[in-house]
From Swiss-Prot:
The gene is rmf. Belongs to the ribosome modulation factor family. The keyword Lipid biosynthesis does not apply. Pfam families: RMF. One of its GO terms (cellular component) is cytoplasm. Its main location: cytoplasm. This is Ribosome modulation factor. During stationary phase, converts 70S ribosomes to an inactive dimeric form (100S ribosomes). Keywords: Cytoplasm, Translation regulation. It is found in: Cytoplasm.
Length: 60
């Protein structure tokens, strides 16, 4: 049985979320395609909010 790949946009969102938790700037977005870039930035914003609200302890 083949494993199904995750959706490209979901991966972009997750990578953005993790980048924010690691303290990376939103300027470091690796995606050039508009949809993927928007998802990455959305994930980055969520990650930044989670980081500032809960602190890093919740994610280590």
């Amino acid at each position: 049985m083949k494993r199904q790949k995750r959706d490209k946009l979901q991966r972009a969102h997750t990578k953005g979320f993790n980048a924010a938790l690691q303290g990376q700037s939103k300027e470091n977005c690796p995606f050039e395609e508009l949809n993927a870039r928007e998802e990455w930035l959305g994930g980055w914003r969520e990650g930044r909010e989670a980081f500032t609200t809960n602190g890093m302890k919740a994610y280590i």
